[in-house]
């Protein structure tokens, strides 16, 4: 496959990685690590993306870690950070990894200029020197080294806490950087929750983010068996904390669409993601819709919110034979289909 632009600029600078024990993190979307592994002493990946983890897990040449925090011991002496779309997530990853790996760790940062990668210059200032060494494909390549003792990292310090009010219920939300709707109540989610019928049985919250939708559903329908899934380890950690903050019970786990779900559900409810990195991305939502019937019970129901311009109805109609519009405003529509 062709490499992403950040990987292409990294490919031009392979000499930086010769003889190094490299840990790759951030917004990595291609299989460039296999090529990089040929030039490094060792190559490992820390990813918060479950789909990407599954792609590399089991390969002998690359050790792959998935989670919201790197906890495993490692002999890494260089970080290759692909700049994520959220600046706060970049700061989270940088602080966490340098606290783990310590002084004298080298770092390479690559990213598209429009993603704000230039922010690394100020962000890294407390750790040591960093400079830009290459520009190509509208991307930048930075190299630096941690020459100061990195402060200790406590994940609890990184949760943003806020409240969501819905129909006389107050939900306490705890959200890590990089999680959808970080710090606010998404208007699409609000319309979805206003439109939902009474829920029963097993309910799946797909793309759970910080756990707002799942927590409201469980608060209003306390007898449901709630599964909450997301591809992001940061979202999983956030949803677990949000449930805990509201004394609610739910089963929260990573899943690449239906890869790890075990149930047939009475309801699949979703505010599905369509921004992956800086590009609009539909494939996971298409799979959610296409395979929904085989993951629903008899007369089970799919209900989702989407931006009005997204062409989901034809996919839903093909899967179910019909697609109903339950509600809409000037930006969002609520779609439903029954098995």
UniProtKB/Swiss-Prot annotation:
Say yes or no: keyword Plastid present: no
Q: Which domain of life is it from?
A: Bacteria
**Intrachain S-S bonds:** none
This entry carries the following GO cellular component terms, namely: cytoplasm
Which terms does the record give in the GO molecular function aspect?
Answer: 16S rRNA (guanine(1207)-N(2))-methyltransferase activity; nucleic acid binding
Q: Which InterPro entries match?
A: DNA_methylase_N6_adenine_CS, Mtase_sm_N, rRNA_ssu_MeTfrase_C, RsmC/RlmG, SAM-dependent_MTases_sf, Small_mtfrase_dom
| Keyword RNA-binding listed | no
What EC number is given for this enzyme? Answer: 2.1.1.172
One Pfam family, please name it.
MTS_N
User: Keywords on this record?
Assistant: Cytoplasm, Methyltransferase, rRNA processing, S-adenosyl-L-methionine, Transferase
**Catalytic function, reaction form:** guanosine(1207) in 16S rRNA + S-adenosyl-L-methionine = N(2)-methylguanosine(1207) in 16S rRNA + S-adenosyl-L-homocysteine + H(+)
| EC category | transferase
Q: How does it assemble?
A: Monomer.
Entry's family note = Belongs to the methyltransferase superfamily. RsmC family.
| Stated role | Specifically methylates the guanine in position 1207 of 16S rRNA in the 30S particle.
Q: What is this protein called?
A: Ribosomal RNA small subunit methyltransferase C
């Amino acid at each position: 496959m062709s490499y992403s632009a950040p990987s292409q600029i990294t490919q031009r600078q392979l000499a930086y990685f010769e003889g190094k024990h490299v840990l790759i993190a951030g917004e990595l979307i291609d299989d460039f690590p296999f090529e990089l592994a040929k030039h490094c002493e060792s190559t490992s990946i820390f990813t918060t993306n479950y789909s990407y983890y599954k792609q590399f897990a089991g390969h002998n040449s690359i050790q792959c870690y998935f989670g919201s925090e790197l906890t495993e011991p490692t002999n890494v002496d260089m970080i290759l950070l692909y700049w994520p779309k959220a600046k706060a997530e970049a700061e989270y990853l940088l602080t966490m990894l340098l606290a783990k790996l310590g002084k004298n760790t080298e770092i390479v940062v690559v990213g598209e200029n429009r993603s704000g990668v230039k922010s690394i210059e100020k962000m890294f200032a407390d750790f040591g020197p960093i400079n830009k060494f290459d520009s190509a494909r509208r991307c930048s390549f930075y190299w630096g080294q941690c020459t100061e003792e990195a402060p200790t990292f406590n994940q609890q310090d990184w949760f943003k806490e806020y409240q969501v009010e819905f129909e006389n219920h107050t939900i306490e939300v705890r959200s890590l950087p990089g999680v959808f709707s970080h710090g606010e109540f998404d208007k699409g989610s609000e319309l979805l929750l206003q439109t939902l019928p009474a829920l029963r049985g097993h309910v799946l919250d797909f793309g759970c983010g910080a756990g707002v939708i799942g927590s409201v559903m469980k608060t209003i329908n306390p007898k449901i068996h709630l599964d909450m899934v997301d591809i992001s380890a940061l979202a999983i950690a956030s949803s677990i904390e949000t449930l805990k903050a509201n004394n609610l019970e739910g089963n929260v786990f990573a899943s690449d669409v239906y890869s790890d779900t075990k149930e047939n559900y009475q309801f699949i409810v979703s505010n599905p993601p369509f921004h992956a990195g800086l590009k609009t991305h539909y494939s996971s939502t298409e799979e959610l819709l296409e395979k929904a019937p085989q993951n629903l019970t008899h007369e089970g129901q799919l209900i989702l919110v989407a931006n009005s311009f997204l062409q989901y109805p034809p996919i839903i109609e093909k899967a179910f034979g019909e697609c109903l519009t339950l509600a809409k405003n000037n930006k969002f529509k609520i779609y439903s289909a029954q098995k």
